[in-house]
Amino acid sequence: MNEIRTKVQIVDIDEDMAGQRIDNFLRNQLKDVPKSMIYRIVRKGEVRVNKKRVKAEYKLAAGDVVRIPPVTLEKKDPETAPSTKLNKVAELQDLIIYEDDHLLVLNKPSGTAVHGGSGLKFGAIEALRALRPEARFLELVHRIDRDTSGILLVAKKRSALRHLQAQFREKTVQKYYFALVMGEWKNSCKVVNAPLLKNEVNSIVRVNPNGKPSETRFKVIEKFPQATLVQASPITGRTHQIRVHTQYSGHPIAWDDRYGDRRFDAYTAQHGLNRLFLHAANIRFTHPATEQPMEINAPMGEQLEKVVQSLRTSR
């Protein structure tokens, strides 16, 4: 069995690294090391902070000195790496629509999860880390559904992550989505205020008086014979919020496998659609370093553009 043994690392913690748990810090430093091994070396006291043992939940402070012990890993056979995974990683390079020293913005394709887990070994964040092996820090600022395409913010510094997530919590980030919904959305329907409750067993979200307050603002962009293209802006950030609010209003989104309408899906399939028509198209926020206002636009993609064009010609 071929094995690789890493070298001892001594890391001085600066302000940007401070505030995170030691286990999360080690997962970023030892990207190919299994989580179980990381927790084992912490538990055994092989990881030292300021020459002392620490627990996994220890939060790093500026000025700490971390000793990361050598670890032994099985050498992977490059021929066993699935080419489909490598192809997906390469494709994402062309979908990075903004990048600087503090953040990166990806125009995530539909069908790609934001991160691995729940049976998925591959996600957008894992792909970006593969594309940027030299990056010391890459973390998701927020999430969008697997089948939703569009803007995904990724922080390249911990300080940027804290700054951007604070903006999301304070609801100062403005997000705008395009959605193709069934039927004629009335111009007068500009706001949907309906509490949402998530079923923890099957993850289905429903409007429920016992749910969390949820608000989405809508604007009609274009009307077609049996569909409407709307702009949706979620004021709150609940799971599946836009998808459930459109369904609740009687206008489910095309190709929504949880909250949609099969007859409408069949109709839009005639116009070339075979995926959820929900796209995170625009985001506005404050840059975490310069404090300047930022506005990022993500094009819808060829398939969605062709569907809209086909619907226009069907009038």
UniProtKB/Swiss-Prot annotation:
It is an enzyme of class 5 (isomerase). It catalyses: uridine(955/2504/2580) in 23S rRNA = pseudouridine(955/2504/2580) in 23S rRNA. InterPro entries: PsdUridine_synth_cat_dom_sf, PsdUridine_synth_RluA-like_CS, PsdUridine_synth_RluC/D, PsdUridine_synth_RsuA/RluA, RluA_PseudoU_synthase, S4_RNA-bd, S4_RNA-bd_sf. The keyword Glycoprotein does not apply. Keywords: Isomerase, RNA-binding, rRNA processing. The keyword tRNA processing does not apply. PROSITE patterns: PSI_RLU, S4. One of its GO terms (biological process) is enzyme-directed rRNA pseudouridine synthesis. Transmembrane segments: none annotated. The active site is at residue 145. GO terms for molecular function: 23S rRNA pseudouridine(955/2504/2580) synthase activity; RNA binding. Its EC number is 5.4.99.24. It comes from the Bacteria. Residues 20-93 form the S4 RNA-binding domain. Belongs to the pseudouridine synthase RluA family. Responsible for synthesis of pseudouridine from uracil at positions 955, 2504 and 2580 in 23S ribosomal RNA. This is Ribosomal large subunit pseudouridine synthase C. It comes from Vibrio vulnificus (strain CMCP6). The lineage of its organism: Bacteria, Pseudomonadati, Pseudomonadota, Gammaproteobacteria, Vibrionales.
